[in-house]
Every structure is written in C-alpha cells, then in structure tokens.
C-alpha cells in the first residue's frame, strides 16, 4: 500500500478524486492494460530465454571448466609423465654416460696396457725371432754340417762296416791262415819230424850204411838241409809277426773309429735336444701369439660393444630431443588451450555482464512498472498521474532501446511493418478517452489512441511506436478482437512464477496481475 499523506480532506474532494482515479484507471486499463500485459509477457519470455541462455552458458562454462580441468590434469599428468620419463631418460643417459666413460677409461687403460704389453711382446717376439733366426741359421748350418757329418758318418760307418767286415774276413782269413800255418807248421813239424826221424833214420841207416863209405859228405849235406829248414821257419815266424802287428793296428783303428762314433752320437743327441727345446720355444711363442690374437679379438668385441653403446647413446639423445619437442608441442597446446580458456572466460564475463545488464534492465523495468502500478498519491491530479505514468513508460522505452542497443532485444523499427495489422485491431477495440484527460497542458501531447510515450513523428507512427518494444515472438495474436483481457491471460503459470521469482526477487509473482485486475 502506498503511504497516506497527513491532513484531512472533505468528502466531496475524496469522492471527486476517487471518481477521477476510477475514470483514469478505466482509461489506462482500456488503453494500456493489453500493452503492459504483452510487454510483461514478452519480458518474461525474454527472461526465460535469457535464463535458458544463461543456463546453457553456465552448462557450457561448467563443461569448458571440466574440459579445462581435464586438459589441465591431462597436461599435468603428461608433463609429469614426460618430465618423469625425461628424468628417467636423463638418468639412464647419465648412467650410460658414466658407464661409457668408465668403459672408455677402462678400454683406454686396457688398450694402453695391451698396447704396452703388445709392444713389449712384439719387442720380445722380435728379439726372440731374431735370436731364433740366428740360432736357426746356426742350427741350419749345424744341421747342414750335421747332414754332411751324417753323410760322412754314414760313409765312414759304411767304410767302418766294410773295414770291420774286411777285418773280420781278414781275421778269419788270418785265423784260418794261422790255423793253416799252425797246422801246416805242426804238420810240417810232424812231417819234418817224421821226415827228419825218417830221414834221420834213413840218414842214420844210410849213414850207417854209408858211414862206412862217405861219413863226411853225408854229414855236410844234412847240416845244409837243416840250415835251409831253419831259414824257412824263421821266414814263417817273421810273416806271423807281421800279421799279428797288422791285426793290432786294425784293432787300434777300430777302437778309434768306435770312439769317434760315440762322439758323433753324443753330438747328435745334443743337437736333438737343442732342436726339441727350440720347438718348445716356437710352440710357446705360437701359444702366446694365439693369446695375443684372442686379446685383440676381445678388444675388437669391446670396441664393437662400445660402438653399440655410443649408437644407443645417440638414439637416447635423439629420443630425448623428440621428448623435448613433444613437451614443447604440449606446452604450445597448453598455451593454446589456456588462450582458448581465457577467450571463453572473456566470453563468459561478457555474457555475465550482458546477463547483469539484462537483470538490471529487467529489475529497472520491474521497478518502473511497480512504481507505475503501485505508486498512488491522493494529492496528485489525474493529469499528473498520467504524465508521471507517461514518463515511466518513456523510461521503459529508453530501457528497451538501451537493451536493443546492447543486442539484448529487438529494435523499435522491426515491429512497424510486421505488427501494423495487429495494432489496427487494437485501435478498433479501444474506448475513447475520457473528457477528463482533455485538460489544459495535456491536449497538445495526448490524443485519442496516442498516449504520448514516443515523440510523435506522424499520425500513423504514433501508435506503432507504443508496441515497438515488443519482441518478434509476441504478435498480439491472442489480443485481436478482444476488448478486455481475461484472467487466464493475466494469470501466471507455475514456471513463469519460478522464473519471475528467481529473476525478480523484489516483486511478488502475482502483484502486477492482481493490481491490473483490481484496477
């Protein structure tokens, strides 16, 4: 209820004012009730659209925030995973670098040791080779001389064997000759003895026979024969002595050749021992050379493994570079998503500002309507009330124009060509204005069918400017051909009440309709 002013007024004045207010209310109700109702419905529909748009924007914002949070979490997880992987790769690279450095140092140390050892072995091998070459040459010379000696030995052994055979044959012949000679000597002695005995006996007989005749001649002849036999025996004895001395010489020669053969056999044994020792040294050097060859093969395998480690190191470096590039691309994607989020945040802020502007416009429109419908002063005259109401409607029009300027509604000129036929029906259904409205100072501004809400352009545009604030959706279809507005059109649905209550908390949902119905 509007506040009452102090002071007492007469019953005639009160009755006159009530009649004036009733007439003005009837005039306002007949001419503006449908306009206010359609405008309120249009504002409610706009509010519903803005509320649905706001809900969509909030849902999109929540979706975008969820997507942004998901992207942020994914980015954080990806970045953490990539950082962890990068750190892992860097640790592996560091470990591989350490291993590579250790292997390189160990390889260098082993290489230096092996090179020094190989150099030393090469020097030793060269010295041994030279020494063995010289010894081999000496041994070759000795072997050649030994071969010559062997040939000579074989020749000498052949000669010695031939000589032994010859000596044996000569010994055998000598023995046989000695035996024959001894036998012959014995036989000759026996024969000579026999002959001598016989001859002695013969000589004795003949001596006895001739002794008597020629004793002296027989004795001389026997003595001469005895002397010749003694000379033959002496010759045979000298021949035997010569054979014995020759046999002794052959035995001495045989003993000397045997001694030389023993010396040559000892030299041959020494040469065989030296040859065996040289073969052992050559075998040892061959084994050592094989060991050095195995060491070189191991070094080659180590070098190959080192090259593989270096290739793995390069591959890990390339993979780390790729991971860094991927991280940079992910950071770029994150920056792009952040920029998109900032753009969406700016759009959201703009939508919030637009929503706030719409809420402010709606609240101001509701406040103006509330002031227009609820404000009632007993001191004001009918012309002042109509003028105040006209100003409020002009302010509402300015609010709607400002909302159209902001892009939140339709402009005034969009309704001029589309809603002209609807406004004609409104003109026919309106009652003529009460004569009370034709007071001084008002007749130039207000006319029949014109509330003066918009500065008058011409007679045809005066009525169109009143409904220019309606949206394109509202076409005044339900109001055609009707003189009054039913209670069903002025009543609020439950959904409109909820939207009205959520958007305009200062105005009760049923206040405008109740006030209009009361008037």
Swiss-Prot record:
GO terms for cellular component: ciliary basal body; cytoplasm. GO terms for biological process: sperm axoneme assembly. It is found in: Cytoplasm, Cytoskeleton, Cilium basal body. GO terms for molecular function: microtubule binding. Residues 1-25 are annotated as: Disordered. The keyword Coiled coil applies. Residues 1-11 have a biased composition (Basic residues). Keywords: Cell projection, Cilium, Coiled coil, Cytoplasm, Cytoskeleton. Residues 28-185, 241-356 form a coiled coil. InterPro entries: CFAP157. Belongs to the CFAP157 family. Specifically required during spermatogenesis for flagellum morphogenesis and sperm motility. This is Cilia- and flagella-associated protein 157. The gene is cfap157.
